From Swiss-Prot:
Keyword Lyase attached: yes
EC number: 4.1.1.48
Pathway: Amino-acid biosynthesis; L-tryptophan biosynthesis; L-tryptophan from chorismate: step 4/5
Protein's gene: trpC
GO terms for MF: indole-3-glycerol-phosphate synthase activity; phosphoribosylanthranilate isomerase activity
Listed name of the protein: Indole-3-glycerol phosphate synthase
Gene3D superfamilies in the record: Aldolase class I (3.20.20.70)
Catalysed reaction equations from the record: 1-(2-carboxyphenylamino)-1-deoxy-D-ribulose 5-phosphate + H(+) = (1S,2R)-1-C-(indol-3-yl)glycerol 3-phosphate + CO2 + H2O
């Protein structure tokens, strides 16, 4: 699935008149393109408000990051659970009306989560970096910044807000982008979770080497439907290389009960990322315990 970035369409100024000529590819073709095109605009605005130099200065005073990958490898639960803090999504709308990030983070910790994932996209998921800041002040678990990262600036934003790991989505990034953004993330002490949706994307990531944490999203980018067998299909051709590179696999989306966790574990997933199914429950901590089969 080709995901296009927003085509350049600079404004032209003639005398006192300023205008832009409509681009023939000026409209996004799907929800992911729509998100990315809006993200381009958001990052530009953020850079004008807070220059990169200011973010770098703030990072100098921050404590060391926590070992996100190490926590997953050493988790006492199998599979390890990355519990997600998410208020809404483009496909489902508002998932949790009574959204209190602090309360949710504490419930997840008590429920046995190994790590947490925090949505920071504001326009489509009603999240924000301020949510990540709140969660960082509340719990000492390793935190993933769940964002549509397309520029290095966002990685600095994540680090300042308290992230220990960042998400890179293979479908929206070139190989060159993945390698450069990895370099930036590593320089800031951040773990990278690179997300793939199909076998070809996983092959790309394995060919690049040096990405020991890979998430397989069970959600179809075209239909937004989920199928746990996606994890099985994506992995089956690459099992040997996954083992050789010591890649830890995370199964993402469509996980609702302990049977689902057992299923993706049988496909090779050592961790799972779960959000919506937990966020809809009145008692999030109890729901997480039940998901993991705790009595």
């Amino acid at each position: 699935m080709e995901i296009r970035r927003r085509p350049p369409n600079p404004k032209v100024k003639v005398a006192n008149l300023e205008y832009a000529i409509p681009h023939e590819d000026g409209e996004p073709r799907n929800i992911l393109e729509k998100i990315l095109w809006e993200k381009d605009r958001e990052v530009k605005v953020s850079r004008e408000r807070v220059p990169l130099s200011e973010l770098k200065a703030q990072i100098n005073n921050l404590p060391q990051t926590k070992d996100f990958l190490g926590a997953l490898r050493q988790s006492s639960t199998s599979p390890a659970v990355i519990a997600e803090i998410k208020k809404a999504s483009p496909s489902k709308g508002v998932i949790r009306e009574n959204f209190d990030p602090i309360e949710i983070a504490l419930a997840y910790k008590l429920g046995g989560a190994t790590c947490l994932s925090v949505l920071t996209d504001k326009s489509f998921f009603q999240g924000g970096f301020e949510v990540l800041v709140q969660v960082r002040k509340t719990v000492d678990l390793p935190l993933l910044c769940k964002e549509f990262i397309i520029q290095p600036y966002q990685i600095y934003q994540a680090r300042v807000a308290g992230a220990d790991a960042v998400l890179l989505i293979a479908a929206i990034l070139s190989d060159q982008d993945l390698l450069y953004l990895r370099k930036v993330a590593i320089s800031l002490g951040l773990t990278i979770l690179v997300e793939v949706h199909d076998s070809n994307e996983l092959k790309r990531v394995l060919d690049l080497e040096g990405f020991p944490l890979v998430g397989i999203n069970n959600r179809d980018l075209k239909t937004f439907n989920t199928d746990l067998r996606t994890t099985k299909e994506v992995v089956k051709e690459h099992k040997k290389r996954i083992s050789e590179q010591e890649v830890l696999l995370v199964s993402e989306s469509g996980l609702f009960n302990s049977a689902d966790l057992e299923e993706v574990s049988s496909y090779g997933a050592k961790a799972v990322l779960v959000g919506e199914s937990l966020m809809r429950q009145p008692d999030i901590g109890l729901a997480l315990k039940n998901l993991q089969g705790f009595k």
